Amino acid sequence: DFKNVDPNGGTVDIEYGLVEKGASQVELQGGYGGNSFIGSIGVSFNNFSLKGLKDKKAWKPVPMGDGQSLSLRLQANRFYRVYSFSLADPWFGGEQPVQFSTSFSHTKQFRYNFFTGSVNKEQFVSITGASIGLAKRLRVPDDYFTLSQSLSYQYYNLQNYFTGLFTFGQGKSNNVSYTVALSRNNTFTNPIFPLGGSEFVLSARFSLPYSLWNGVDYGSLGELPEFQDSNGDPDQSKIDQEKYKWLEFYKIKFKGSWYTRLFDKLVLRTHAEFGFLGAYNNDRGVIPFDRFFLGGDGMSQYAMDGREMISMRGYPNQSLSSQNGSTIYNKFSLELRYPITLKPAASIFGLTFIESGQGFDKFRDYNPFNSKRSMGVGLRIFMPAFGLLGIDFGYGLDSINDNDLNPNGWETHFVIGQNF
């Protein structure tokens, strides 16, 4: 509609009538894994409105229009269940682009006998977690920087469930931590296939240093009667339960990618990442939670200890870290990309890569030049309805076992959602 036409001033007000476009997604998946069928159902509302909850007329089927994101998801099989909820508001306060986010999740895994197929629901491990965070776009040094902060809590409960990750199978652990991250993203044109720019994130996660004020001498726990077995020897299970009642740690991570356009649409992606998990108190040691597991496709597989999966093509999953996980790792990669099509309905591009990486148990063992190498080719397909899908064929140039001189050989990796 045209309003306030001013022939003398040469101005006119144009009023557009807008209709909300549906941006919601429903996820229904089913599959077979771990000798059991697994199903998931989820719903995401990407233009949700909290203000409209009280307005009965706004429920069509849910209140929409404020750009908030609401997600609900359930995944389950015979012995594994995950419930999750998240809410994000990109314009918290309404005046500046400050993002507020909150989430809640509950995971429970029962004892499962893979030989008989029986499930014992009296034996289980569960994790209940919640977080709240704020992220703000910065203007200094430039407009591409974002500062984010979050506070999170996880409650671990083991009921007669020995995972092999800890010396105890009966006990509880609490994890209260604060995370601060500085990120910069100036990738331009297509976010699925950047032709230039860079993106990086530097983050630090801290727990409280409980050992500074709780008065516990963790190095002498084995000398106390309550932490000894019937023979008077130190009971490591009881000692670890005391050590990990409240988790104490700090975690530093860096991840960065640079995109260089060589010619036409041939792009070189240079990528580097690093992570370190440390302890405040040497007598308490590094926690068995939140460790790094390097190798393979990087997809989580019933991870009940907060472990962080790091992809490394050309090698089996988690094969470049010890059984208990790494406390420090690094990874470097070079990737040549060329698009087949970049249409809105589907973006497809091929790639070839070389990369190296390695996980280490202790900081004193860290050597960035002692890395496993790989090379290979891959394909990526992005469709709005399905997200990012892909496949990589990687050739491990080194052996997983340092005493073996033969290369690991070919590995096939499937990509669902995540980037390498």
Model-derived segments and spans:
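C-terminal outer-membrane beta-barrel translocator/porin domains of Gram-negative envelope proteins
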Residues: 7-10, 14, 24-35, 44, ...
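Hydrophobic alpha-helical bundle architecture
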Residues: 335-343, 366-367, 380
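Strand-loop-strand
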Residues: 362, 368-383, 389, 401
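Gram-negative/organellar outer-membrane beta-barrel architecture
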Residues: 1-193, 198-199, 310, 325, ...
